[in-house]
């Protein structure tokens, strides 16, 4: 009898896993197919110089081939992966374009898988407990949330309707998914893993023997952060800034009693610091008689693209703001959610107050860090909303949860339409 019960349990578990894996695999396959097509068109059209499917893919392809692109890309992960794939595709017509598109797609889709794993790890058990009659549903919910997050965008009105002070749909507002920038997309699997690993270490690193008990987590965090930096440093600058201020604040608050644990966690940043010094050496060297280095401003660069910053913020992170207002107590309970907002604030401050001097000023390169801040604000909000969905055991709670999902859906509908424009070759801004 016991063997029969155990056998039925195994069959149910296998069925649950089969349904969950099949649905998630189908979602990732569809997302991979459409994003690969976009990346491939960007590669082809950029090499042809048609002006359609605007991107920096031509420079990336030249960098991958070891040719002079006219730019400096001291972050090699995407280019090395594409070069490895090119060993196979070189004999094909358009093999270089195919290799770069495949590399970008693989890393972007890998980020979807990484996010799904993290959502399951941090909220999966709570969802399973709330849905005992449908054991396959929590996995489908986290999988759908993970994939859909890679298609959300800023909120924007229909064509022909203009909002006060908003000059562009994208520029000045910004999106968590800038489909025209391959290095941003490629860095996200490592950024996601580094973000969650740091969030997991925050509650424990000050404890006695934390290094000994969580040595593997320290090492993994250092590796993830270095890989993210070597793919695109924009996320790293934000995380390092937010983490540095947070760790210093904790150290001062404890009157340096946690000095040694803080140093041990700080050691994880050393490989990344060394790589950042290598990458940013060119920023501080004036070129062609122009001023170099990092300057301080008061939103001057941002103001070139937007005249209504409060509205732009609302359009970019309306969903995370709503989740925060309705679940503000989670800031005290959840270190990962709290750090998602600390990261967003740091990304905003950097974009508002800092800029690269000289010819790089108009590029507004600190906006890439801001977009990572937006992305992880969405990640944190999704974590909280999935948890709230599991706890929605009354009519009032279900209504509140539904309102938050509707806000997310609004960003998603705008994002899908924004992505559709990319597929048609439209400009990103």
Can you describe what each PLM-predicted range is?
Residues 102-132, 147, 193:
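Transmembrane-helix motifs of polytopic, lipid-linked glycan transferases
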Residues 269-276, 281-429:
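Transmembrane helical bundles and short interhelical boundary loops of multi-pass, membrane-embedded
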Residues 59-102:
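Short hydrophobic/aromatic helix or loop-helix immediately within or flanking a transmembrane segment
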Residues 239-269:
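Perimembrane helix-loop-helix junctions
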Residues 1-41, 126-144:
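Start-transfer (signal-anchor) and selected internal transmembrane alpha helices
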Residues 217-233, 239:
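Membrane-interface alpha helices of multi-pass inner-membrane proteins
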Residues 137-202, 308-312, 364-374:
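Membrane-interface micro-motifs in multi-pass membrane enzymes
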């Amino acid at each position: 009898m016991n063997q029969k019960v155990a056998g039925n349990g195994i069959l149910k578990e296998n069925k649950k896993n089969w349904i969950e894996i099949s649905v998630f695999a189908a979602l990732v396959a569809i997302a991979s197919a459409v994003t690969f097509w976009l990346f491939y068109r960007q590669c082809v059209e950029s090499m042809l110089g048609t002006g359609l499917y605007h991107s920096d893919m031509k420079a990336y392809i030249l960098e991958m081939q070891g040719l002079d692109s006219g730019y400096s890309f001291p972050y090699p992960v995407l280019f090395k992966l594409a070069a490895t794939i090119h060993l196979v595709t070189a004999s094909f017509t358009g093999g270089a374009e195919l290799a770069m598109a495949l590399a970008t797609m693989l890393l972007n889709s890998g980020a979807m898988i990484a996010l799904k794993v993290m959502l399951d790890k941090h909220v999966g058990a709570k969802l399973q407990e709330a849905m005992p009659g449908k054991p396959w549903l929590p996995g489908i919910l986290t999988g759908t949330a993970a994939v859909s997050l890679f298609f959300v965008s800023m909120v924007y009105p229909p064509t022909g309707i203009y909002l006060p002070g908003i000059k562009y749909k994208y520029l000045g507002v910004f999106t968590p998914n800038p489909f025209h920038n391959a290095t941003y997309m490629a860095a996200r699997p490592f950024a996601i893993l580094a973000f969650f690993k740091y969030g997991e270490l925050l509650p424990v690193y000050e404890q006695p023997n934390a290094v000994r008990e969580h040595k593997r987590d320290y090492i993994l965090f250092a590796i993830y952060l270095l890989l993210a930096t070597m793919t695109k440093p924009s996320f790293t600058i934000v995380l390092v800034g937010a983490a540095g201020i947070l760790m210093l604040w904790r150290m001062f608050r404890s009157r340096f009693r946690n000095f040694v644990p803080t140093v041990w966690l700080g050691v994880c940043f050393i490989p990344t610091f060394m790589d950042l010094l290598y990458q940013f050496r060119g920023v501080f060297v004036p070129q062609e008689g122009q001023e170099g280095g990092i300057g301080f401003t008061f939103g001057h660069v941002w103001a070139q693209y937007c005249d209504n910053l409060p509205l732009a913020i609302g359009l970019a992170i309306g969903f995370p703001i709503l989740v925060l207002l309705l679940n503000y107590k989670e800031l005290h309970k959840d270190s990962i959610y709290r750090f998602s907002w600390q990261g967003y604030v740091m990304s905003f401050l950097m974009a508002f107050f800092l800029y690269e001097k000289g010819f790089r000023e108009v590029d507004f390169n600190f906006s890439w860090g801001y977009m990572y801040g937006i992305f992880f604000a969405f990640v944190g909000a999704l974590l909280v909303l999935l948890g709230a969905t599991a706890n929605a055991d009354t009519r009032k709670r279900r209504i509140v949860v539904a309102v938050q999902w509707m806000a997310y859906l609004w960003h998603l509908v705008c994002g899908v339409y924004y992505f559709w424009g990319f597929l048609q070759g439209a400009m990103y801004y």
